[in-house]
From Swiss-Prot:
Pfam families: Ssb-like_OB. InterPro entries: NA-bd_OB-fold, Ssb-like_OB. One of its GO terms (molecular function) is mRNA binding. The keyword Acetylation applies. PANTHER family: OB DOMAIN-CONTAINING PROTEIN, OS05G0244600 PROTEIN. The keyword ATP-binding does not apply. This is Uncharacterized protein At4g28440. Keywords: Acetylation.
Amino acid sequence: MATTGTAAVATGTSTVKRKPVFVKVEQLKPGTTGHTLTVKVIEANIVVPVTRKTRPASSLSRPSQPSRIVECLIGDETGCILFTARNDQVDLMKPGATVILRNSRIDMFKGTMRLGVDKWGRIEATGAASFTVKEDNNLSLVEYELINVGGDQ
């Protein structure tokens, strides 16, 4: 059983890792996961955390640490999308930085796409990219609606 979080195939005594397939921003679709892409951070906006008035009794014994959330506009030469950075990820997502997002997923928020990296994914800082971000193709501005297809209406 692999515990490193990477896809690996056991072949005898050695382990062969699967090569990452890099995708472009314009190829992202709702409800998909496992994306690896190289992007530039265009802007980063802090999201004010919502404080909850009531807490369960089990969580009163430990102090609450406020979570840091930043919505970043990221992109490549094909388009851009909003990325939700949480806690330690916030430090890497500075405007102008180039990062590699590994095993990222598309989350839907109010009918729009957001890119995210959970505990199974990784964000790596990399050298400056040579591409210019195409900001006029923002996939987060496209609103999706779930339509039930069937005869029971």
